């Protein structure tokens, strides 16, 4: 079994896309409109068929609580190597 997609909760998909693509160098894979949001994924340029990062809107109230709790406790939600 292999992980295909993993989510990164973002406040703004357009800003997150600019950061992950232009600053970190990830390559856009899918950009599919879905109402107010998009199914927006990127992959590593070193492994274009690897795990897709889904830039997932943090619109659900629980995601904001989750992110705030991790930040308050100093726990990183994502790590790249």
Q: In which residue ranges do the predicted regions lie?
A:
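Conserved active-site tyrosine of GNAT-family acetyltransferases
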Residues: 16-21
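Vicinal oxygen chelate
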Residues: 1-7, 27-81
């Amino acid at each position: 079994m292999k992980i295909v997609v993993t989510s990164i909760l973002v406040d703004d998909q357009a800003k997150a896309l600019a950061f992950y693509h232009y600053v970190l160098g990830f390559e856009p894979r899918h950009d599919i409109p879905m109402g107010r949001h998009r199914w927006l994924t990127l992959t590593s340029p070193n492994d274009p068929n690897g795990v897709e990062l889904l830039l997932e809107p943090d619109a659900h109230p629980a995601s904001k609580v989750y992110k705030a709790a991790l930040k308050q406790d100093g726990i990183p939600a994502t790590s790249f190597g």
